[in-house]
From Swiss-Prot:
Gene3D superfamilies: Luciferase-like domain. The keyword Repeat does not apply. Keywords: Flavoprotein, FMN, Monooxygenase, NADP, Oxidoreductase. The FMN-N(5)-oxide reacts spontaneously with NADH to produce FMN. Requires the flavin reductase RutF to regenerate FMN in vivo. It catalyses: uracil + FMNH2 + NADH + O2 = (Z)-3-ureidoacrylate + FMN + NAD(+) + H2O + H(+); thymine + FMNH2 + NADH + O2 = (Z)-2-methylureidoacrylate + FMN + NAD(+) + H2O + H(+). This is Pyrimidine monooxygenase RutA. CDD domains: Alkanesulfonate_monoxygenase. GO terms for molecular function: alkanesulfonate monooxygenase activity; uracil oxygenase activity. The gene is rutA.
Length: 382
């Protein structure tokens, strides 16, 4: 396989501008993000995620994030049928780490904002101010129908109205310890939360629709987006540009953090063979479920996250951007990611998390010009 990314050279000023943060998307669900019978098969456990978070911290990753998933896709691999809960997992990880930032995901249809505010303040205390919250509106209807809390399909078109009220309650409670917010979805009557977080609580989101980006531009500290394609590291640039345009309306600085899967080995050819092997084992039954669910939302337009996830181009890993190559090739492609205006960081998954993080820290990160500021630290831990 030929290197998809040309070698880049940067001046010192460029290196400073292109300094990029790295996060790990910990596998809270079984089998991580590969919907394949040929991929590693494993259950989510605290011990596994503890080892991943500690290894990521060892190699100076900046943050760890867990999603929330309440119902999986089934199939031969029982994909995401087995999941831990995000806040309790991240509270545990906060207690066994010391530097890395920790983010949990709130499925906002399942948790009142006042409860999330208090849980977040608690994990802020556990972590010493290293905690933040990822807010999701919910796209997979069966997750909520199974509990009898799906608000009806009109929710698809009103979900960011709901989330806007939700985050206003959170900001009230974290900022002042009190909320009397009155809206269409929430009514607070002298609602109290104390103690408040020790530092301002970070709120993140993953909006790719126009409504999602408008929300992030107004309320989020940064916004996640999907990478696109295989070995096309800058293909997400139009999405990052849309996010920058959205912030022009609010006057806020909200950077994009891009989701990629890293599959790396000694050579490009060896890694390409591994990627083709994963694709050959695609769990078609689970993928059919994903496609079916992506078609339930007929009201939000064509630019939502779930529409990209179900695209058949690379559905075996939910169509996140995929970087497949030698350690040097992956390092060059990640430097290309850093060159995109508005891209402040990446959120990484791996085909094998423990070995993947180790080889990233030992073999890839030292070659990345956008991580050159860590050279002294990586020499210490190598």
């Amino acid at each position: 396989m030929q290197d998809a990314a040309p070698r880049l050279t940067f001046t010192l000023r460029d290196e400073e501008r292109l300094m990029m943060k790295i996060g790990v998307f910990v596998p809270i669900g079984n089998n991580g993000w590969l919907i394949s019978t040929h991929a590693p098969q494993y259950m989510p456990t605290f011990e596994l995620n503890k080892a991943i978070a500690q290894k990521a911290e060892h190699y100076h990753f900046d943050f760890a994030l867990s999603m929330i998933k309440l119902r999986g896709f089934g199939g031969k691999t029982e994909f995401w049928d087995h999941n831990l809960e995000s806040f309790t997992l991240m509270a545990g990880l906060a207690a066994v780490t010391s530097r890395i930032q920790i983010y949990a995901t709130a499925a906002t249809l399942t948790l009142p904002p006042a409860i999330v505010a208090r849980m977040a303040a608690t994990i802020d205390s556990i972590s010493g101010g290293r905690f933040g919250v990822n807010l999701v509106t919910g796209w997979q209807k069966p997750e909520y129908e199974q509990m009898g809390i799906w608000p009806g399909d009109d929710y698809f078109s009103r979900r960011y109205d709901y989330l806007t009220e939700y985050v206003q309650v959170l900001r009230d409670l974290w900022g002042t310890g009190k909320s009397d917010f009155k809206g269409d979805f929430f009514t607070m009557n002298d609602c109290r939360v104390s103690p408040q977080p020790s530092i301002p609580m970070k709120v993140i989101c993953a909006g790719q629709s126009d409504a999602g980006m408008a929300f992030s531009a107004q309320y989020a500290d940064f916004n996640f987006c999907f990478g696109k394609g295989v070995n096309t590291p800058t293909a997400f640039a139009p999405t990052a540009a849309r996010m920058k345009q959205a912030t022009e309306q609010t006057g806020r600085d909200v950077g994009s953090y891009v989701l990629f899967m890293v599959i790396a080995d000694e050579t490009d050819d060896a890694t390409r063979a591994k990627w083709e092997h994963y694709k050959a084992g695609a769990d078609e039954e689970a993928l059919s479920w994903l496609t079916e669910q992506s078609q339930k939302d007929t009201r939000s337009g064509t630019d939502t996250n779930v529409r990209q996830m179900a695209d058949p181009t690379s559905a075996v890993n939910i169509n996140m951007g995929t970087l497949v190559g030698s350690y040097a090739s992956v390092a060059r492609m990640l430097d290309e990611v850093a060159s995109v205006p508005g891209a402040e960081g990446v959120l990484l998954t791996f085909d094998d998390f423990l070995s993947g993080i180790e080889t990233f820290g030992e073999r890839i990160q030292p070659l990345m010009q956008c991580r050159a500021h860590l050279s002294a630290l990586t020499q210490e831990v190598a």
